[in-house]
Amino acid sequence: REFNSAISKTLDLQEILDRTIRVMKELMDVGNIYICMQKAPGEAYCGVASDQPLNDLAFSLEEENPMIQWLKDHEEPLVYRDFRYSVEYKSMWEEEKHHLDKKHTCYCAGLKDGDTLAGVILITADSGKKRLVYDEVELISNITSVASIAIKNARMYEKACIEARTDEMTGLLNRKYFHEVLHEEFEKNKDGSLALALINVDDFKLYNQLYGLKEG
């Protein structure tokens, strides 16, 4: 309940991921937890958060990975021990299998944004744990359902912020964003000195008038 309340009050994506990891560590007897997120369709799912600051996040899961495809098609978390007997597992590259086996993966869960798989949670087994607890599957499912809604809201907010700061025609940052940055820099340098240089491009306005704003 505390997790649900806290996560619904923030639109900060990193905070949502950190809180999701924290509640899983508190409620389950597991090893390490990793979260991989996809920035854009077609791109790989890259490591962005973990329960340990020193854990290596320099890894990724390709969108074509059969395990990723399984998570896209299913709502429930994946029990890795059972998944090893599936057709999807057998169709994975040996390198992909080795990477997951080396981490002692025990569960994988999807973070959904509607029909899109926005992210993946990898949960590894604790070294002293002898068996899986299937009640944990339901717990993981409940946590990821709440986290998925929060992530969707955070991504929508981030998209709205980017659109508000970007010129629709040129794709460049607009005057509103310029004033935001100017205000931030002024606040950071209130006790010091700050200089602003404006550069004018010769005949730029004329070029826009002749060939159009998009071309300019």
Where are the predicted features?
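Signal-transducing coupling segments at domain and membrane junctions
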Residues: R81-T105
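A short, aliphatic-rich beta-strand micro-motif
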Residues: H104-K112
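Regulatory loop-to-helix N-cap segments in sensory/regulatory domains
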Residues: D101, T124-S141
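Acidic/proline- and glycine-rich, intrinsically disordered low-complexity segments
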Residues: L54-E88
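Sensory-domain boundary capping and coupling elements
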Residues: L111-D126, A150
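Allosteric cytosolic regulatory segments
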Residues: S141-S148
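Helix-loop-beta substructure at the N-terminus of cytosolic sensory domains
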Residues: K9-C46, N65
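Conserved nucleotide-binding and Mg2+-coordinating catalytic segments in signaling enzymes
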Residues: S5, E158-E180, I199-E215
